[in-house]
Amino acid sequence: MHKLVLASGSPRRKELLAQLGYTFDVVLPDIEECKAEQETAAEYVLRLSQQKAQAGLALVSESSIVVGSDTVVVCDGQVLEKPHHFADAQRMLTQLSDRRHQVMTAVTVVSAEKQHSIVVTTEVWFKKLTQEEIEQYWQSGEPCDKAGSYGIQGLGGRFVTRIEGSYSAVVGLPLYETDQLLHEFI
């Protein structure tokens, strides 16, 4: 019997994996999240999910199956990661205001024998944001730990006018695709 492990400290990923009905343990892999200069957003998010899964596998028993995931927001070809401070979040949210952007979530499932990955891209449209809305949103504390400085599942959902793709992928773990990957291992 294989033990399932989530290599992530994200409460949203924990909730989503539990929503699929799986029982799992959690490990916190320590990897450096730094985009290489020539790397595309899809290559970057895929590499991070693979590194998280592999680092997680190194922390658990050989018979484990490990899920690693990462999410990035992309606007104008630029990767928007977690903000470091208010000015960072303000810049990102102003850039996303009244436009479309992409949210890319990569999932990697790995065992001692094999590894499978997928990148899910969702198109997201934002309403026009005022500076007051951006400041109030920052004061809520929600943007601090989120790629692109917003969480669609929280207060940031009020900014989203439309999505095309996977809502759960925008939150942090695409349910359908993750379940399909896990069925290749379990």
Swiss-Prot record:
A Gene Ontology BP annotation from the UniProt entry: nucleotide metabolic process
SS bond partners: none
Record-annotated site: Important for substrate specificity: R12, T71, Q153
Organism placement in taxonomy: Bacteria, Pseudomonadati, Pseudomonadota, Gammaproteobacteria, Vibrionales
Residue numbers annotated as active site: D70
Protein name: dTTP/UTP pyrophosphatase
Compartment(s) of residence: Cytoplasm
Keywords: Cytoplasm, Hydrolase, Nucleotide metabolism
Pfam families assigned: Maf
Annotated organism of origin: Vibrio vulnificus (strain YJ016)
Co-factor(s): a divalent metal cation
CDD domains from the UniProt entry: Maf (cd00555)
Similarity comment: Belongs to the Maf family. YhdE subfamily.
Protein function: Nucleoside triphosphate pyrophosphatase that hydrolyzes dTTP and UTP. May have a dual role in cell division arrest and in preventing the incorporation of modified nucleotides into cellular nucleic acids.
Catalytic activity: dTTP + H2O = dTMP + diphosphate + H(+); UTP + H2O = UMP + diphosphate + H(+)
